[in-house]
Amino acid sequence: MSADIRFDSLKTIVPAVSRETADRLIAFEDLFRKWSKAINLASPSTLADLWNRHILDSAQLFPLAKEATRWLDIGSGGGFPGIVTACFLAERSGGCIDLVESAGKKAAFLRTAAGHLYVPARVHSARIESMWEKIETPQVVTARALASLGDLFTLAEPWLSDGAKALFQKGRDYQREIDESRVGWSFDLVKHPSAIDQASVILEISNLRRKTD
């Protein structure tokens, strides 16, 4: 797939995207493929369609909170959506994203990617719970393929209960996860259909509170 085709496909997700951001994302794809030969960053079955399955899928989050400058991505793994978001924030004055990843090799990759791409990302090689009091409440918390919705609420509660909103990407079982999480939590919810996978959604969560009854 040529750079022009990638750029055009990216514009269908983020119409106002610059060529500079697209070039960063293309460079990230190349770096990801290189590192994937040495460490397991993503399922091998998805590497053939890495641009669509991971990069475009991650890119669709940014327009949902495009005015936000302070982001946090938990369980960042191979950088989806964290490094992708950082590529967009690189052109935003004062923009920054914190990436939390407990696996040392993946955290090393994230640091390399952030430096290679010159993007405003801070990488924390730590468990999410250990960062509750160390990372200032962001405007947006993201997570992709990390845990059930209820478990994500527990992991992100200190930030979400302090005014941050969440953008969590979920697959076909999302409604069951929503129903189960409402047993212990109250929250406002907006469901955004995925532009990449018709069976998936992006759950926009705000005003999270733990139920006490």
From Swiss-Prot:
Any one cellular-component term (Gene Ontology): cytosol
Role noted for this protein: Specifically methylates the N7 position of guanine in position 527 of 16S rRNA.
Enzyme Commission code(s) on record: 2.1.1.170
Protein name, UniProt field: Ribosomal RNA small subunit methyltransferase G
Gene Ontology MF annotations: rRNA (guanine-N7-)-methyltransferase activity
HAMAP family named in the record: 16SrRNA_methyltr_G
Keyword Methyltransferase belongs to the record: yes
Signal sequence residues: none
Chemical reaction(s) catalysed: guanosine(527) in 16S rRNA + S-adenosyl-L-methionine = N(7)-methylguanosine(527) in 16S rRNA + S-adenosyl-L-homocysteine
Family statement drawn from the similarity comment of this UniProt entry: Belongs to the methyltransferase superfamily. RNA methyltransferase RsmG family.
Cross-referenced Pfam families: GidB (PF02527)
Keywords from the UniProt entry: Cytoplasm, Methyltransferase, rRNA processing, S-adenosyl-L-methionine, Transferase
Binding-site residues for S-adenosyl-L-methionine, renumbered to this chain: 75, 80, 128-129, 144
Alphabetical list of Gene3D superfamilies matching this protein: Vaccinia Virus protein VP39
Top-rank EC class of the record's enzyme: transferase
NCBIfam families from the UniProt entry: rsmG_gidB (TIGR00138)
UniProt entry tagged with the keyword Methyltransferase: yes
Subcellular location field: Cytoplasm
